[in-house]
């Protein structure tokens, strides 16, 4: 039986939720320029992670939210956005609907830094309305120490970490030749630049440029998936033990 909710019949869903499966995974991304990877990089990575962790945490995967809040790279070709208000209302409605459908726990795999504050607010508000528990994974932040240990340097927007994950998910979506024509933008604290001065944004001087080693990318992706799954399991155990009487 499929782990994707949209591929189940309503009878199959009723047999699973919540008796056998009480957790849903919701990938969230946006459409945004990413150097030499696809415009949907922030979608591709959360969907890949969701597929890889579903079996590890006994979860079903909800349909992805593909449109998000794009800011600094919105002027670049192909970048798209929705308003902050629309995003909050829509994602909140989706979260509430998942809980009312029978899920008790929700894992949001977020692929875009522009959603961090909004998703935190939503997790709290939706809990107040439904009692549903949410864990939000900003994957690149959670795995940053491992990224530095694995590559010996930090990642960046459309940098080595995101490029490696897309490469592991679908090598055809990575176009190394495009990087030759891209001047990366080096972020500097104490400044604000709009629009961003490049579709590759580096946060540490001399660190984070994309890499294109497929085998190394696959190894990195495995570590990312394991780290995320392990963290979620710890959270679930904490909820089960410490909130059992309040659920």
Predicted regions and their residues:
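Extended, histidine- and acidic-residue-enriched regions that form the cofactor-binding/catalytic faces
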Residues: 1-85, 89-107, 113-247
């Amino acid at each position: 039986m499929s782990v994707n909710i949209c591929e189940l019949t309503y009878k199959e869903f009723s047999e699973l939720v919540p008796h056998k499966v009480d957790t849903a995974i919701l990938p969230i991304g946006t459409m945004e320029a990413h150097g030499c990877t696809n415009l949907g990089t922030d979608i591709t990575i959360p969907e890949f992670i969701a597929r890889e962790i579903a079996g590890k945490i006994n979860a079903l995967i909800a349909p992805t939210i593909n449109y998000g809040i794009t800011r600094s790279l919105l002027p670049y070709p192909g970048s798209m956005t929705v308003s902050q208000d629309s995003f909050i209302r829509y994602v909140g409605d989706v979260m509430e609907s998942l809980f009312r459908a029978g899920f008790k726990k929700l894992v949001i795999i977020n692929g875009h830094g522009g959603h961090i504050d909004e998703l935190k607010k939503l997790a709290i508000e939706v809990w107040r309305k439904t009692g549903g528990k949410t864990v939000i994974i900003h994957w690149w932040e959670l795995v940053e120490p491992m990224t530095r240990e694995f590559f010996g340097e930090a990642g960046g927007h459309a940098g080595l970490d995101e490029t490696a994950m897309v490469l592991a998910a679908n090598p055809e979506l990575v176009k190394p030749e495009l990087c030759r024509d891209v001047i990366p933008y080096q972020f500097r604290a104490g400044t604000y630049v709009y629009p961003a001065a490049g579709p590759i944004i580096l946060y540490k001087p001399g660190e984070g440029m994309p890499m294109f080693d497929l085998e190394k990318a696959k190894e990195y992706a495995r570590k990312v998936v394991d780290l995320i799954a392990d963290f979620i399991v710890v959270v679930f155990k904490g909820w089960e033990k410490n909130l059992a009487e309040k659920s």
